[in-house]
Amino acid sequence: MANIRKSHPLLKIINHSLIDLPAPSNISTWWNFGSLLGICLGLQILTGLFLAMHYTSDTLTAFSSVTHICRDVNYGWIIRYLHANGASMFFICLFLHVGRGIYYGSYNYLETWNIGIILLFALMATAFMGYVLPWGQMSFWGATVITNLLSAIPYVGTSLVEWIWGGFSVDKATLTRFFAFHFILPFIITALVIVHLLFLHETGSNNPTGLDSNADKIPFHPYYTIKDILGFIIMFLFLMILVLFMPDMLGDPDNYTPANPLSTPPHIKPEWYFLFAYAILRSIPNKLGGVLALILSILILILMPLLHTSAQRSLMFRPIGQCLFWILVGDLFILTWIGGQPVEHPFIIIGQLASIMYFTIILILMPLAGILENKIMKL
């Protein structure tokens, strides 16, 4: 009789995805982040479910319901901070995962890459709506400013914004629908993750060299399960340090003030993981231009496979490409820093230069580096 994990219709799928999956023998720690993202998603759904049991999506009681969770609910404070800082860990893993994909040329798996970009947009939407729910000052004004960007769309913009708000300003209707969407989106994301994995398993994983690894495969379990567990322990350690020692480090102090439509905070900014895109948005003096740049800063990832000019898939043996990649990483750090600064000299010009640099590296310099490296290879 065959092993049940190989014969049972349901267990067979899990077996082929997580146990007997043939994996390249040389994938490094950079390949850990996919599983870590899965763990993060599970943690967010679980903690979010328990928070939703006590949260009320009403403008009059939302802020006090979050306070109630932290003060009166058994271990409510740890559930709340696990959820808030879990989102930060989620985005750290996400950026590293996407960075790995760019560095090692994983974007050449078109379906997997494009589903990944859809996932990225879905996660950003979910995180943004989640930030509105505690109904603090930054929640309210962040929601007002970001949703207001849609009014830049010609002709239909204003109607669209009022339709999203459910009125003439961010109010009770907005909060209620944001809570509904914030609750449902993670389950849609889970479905997309399954599709993401389905497409990945059609081709198999890429590896650091970017070469075909069919000649040298090893089973996923036990080799990579144990490696993923190590990654999970390290991530959980960092998360618990954040949650237990500095839970508010990545948050905004303004969010401890209940939302007040009559008082604008001196500096409105989103969560730290959106600051790079926010800096690109602010670097363009025109509203519509800024919104387009904001969308393109993420949508540019779709062009990655088209902009690949090198004969080699990975950046592992491409020194010029490597230099440009790490300059791009540095540029993203600068943009993140600028996004959190007030709009004044010298931050404006730094933000504009960093934004130009971001698009120039991806659209012009990286493809040119690929062509140049091809020519050097033929010498």
Curated annotation (Swiss-Prot):
Subcellular location per the Swiss-Prot or TrEMBL entry: Mitochondrion inner membrane
Cofactor section: heme b
Binding site for heme b b566: 97, 196
UniProt-annotated binding residues for heme b b562: 83, 182
GO cellular component, one term: respiratory chain complex III
Primary location group: mitochondrion
Annotated keywords: Electron transport, Heme, Iron, Membrane, Metal-binding, Mitochondrion, Mitochondrion inner membrane, Respiratory chain, Transmembrane, Transmembrane helix, Transport, Ubiquinone
Entry keyword annotation includes Transmembrane helix: yes
Record Gene3D superfamilies: Cytochrome Bc1 Complex, Chain C (1.20.810.10)
Example GO BP: mitochondrial electron transport, ubiquinol to cytochrome c
Cofactor binding, note field: Binds 2 heme b groups non-covalently.
Membrane topology summary: Multi-pass membrane protein
Misc. comment: Heme 1 (or BL or b562) is low-potential and absorbs at about 562 nm, and heme 2 (or BH or b566) is high-potential and absorbs at about 566 nm.
SUBUNIT field: The cytochrome bc1 complex contains 11 subunits: 3 respiratory subunits (MT-CYB, CYC1 and UQCRFS1), 2 core proteins (UQCRC1 and UQCRC2) and 6 low-molecular weight proteins (UQCRH/QCR6, UQCRB/QCR7, UQCRQ/QCR8, UQCR10/QCR9, UQCR11/QCR10 and a cleavage product of UQCRFS1). This cytochrome bc1 complex then forms a dimer.
Protein name, UniProt field: Cytochrome b
Source species: Myospalax aspalax (False zokor)
Lineage of the organism: Eukaryota, Metazoa, Chordata, Craniata, Vertebrata
